[in-house]
């Protein structure tokens, strides 16, 4: 981490002896060692947190890339379901209307009535002859 060579360590030791004194130097070195270890742990912890955050950020980006098409498909499915539900409701309403309406009944067939000769002639537009002028009638009158 600190790429310190042999001569740099000798220089730091000489400065430490001059500043702190030979009696307190081992205690100061021990304290510096503890501080360096704590600093290294903190730095590695921060580094791990940053890497974890970067991984999380990548995962979020990946999820958002997957999420958009998935949302579109879900919206299309919802639209299809809503349309099917609407169609079913309309079909149900039409079915209920058909059930509520009376069924179509054909009008009863016209009664076949026997037409009299006069009615039949009237329908044709020809008038019947008098009974008195018919030959059968004359024959019956003469016989009497």
Swiss-Prot record:
It comes from Dichelobacter nodosus (strain VCS1703A). This is Sec-independent protein translocase protein TatB. Belongs to the TatB family. The chain crosses the membrane at residues 1-21. It is a single-pass membrane protein. One of its GO terms (biological process) is protein transport by the Tat complex. One of its GO terms (molecular function) is protein transmembrane transporter activity. It comes from the Bacteria.
């Amino acid at each position: 981490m600190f790429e310190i060579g042999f001569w740099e360590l000798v220089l730091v030791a000489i400065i430490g002896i001059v500043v702190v004194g030979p009696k307190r130097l081992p205690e100061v070195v021990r304290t510096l060692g503890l501080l360096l270890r704590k600093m290294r742990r903190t730095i590695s912890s921060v580094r791990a947190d940053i890497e974890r955050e970067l991984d999380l950020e990548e995962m979020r980006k990946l999820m958002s890339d997957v999420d958009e098409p998935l949302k579109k498909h879900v919206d299309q499915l919802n639209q299809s379901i809503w349309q099917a539900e609407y169609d079913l409701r309309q079909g149900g309403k039409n079915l209920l209307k058909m059930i509520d309406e009376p069924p179509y009944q054909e009008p009863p067939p016209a009664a076949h009535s026997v037409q009299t000769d006069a009615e039949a002639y009237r329908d044709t537009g020809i008038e019947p002859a008098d009974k008195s002028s018919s030959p059968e009638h004359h024959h019956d009158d003469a016989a009497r």
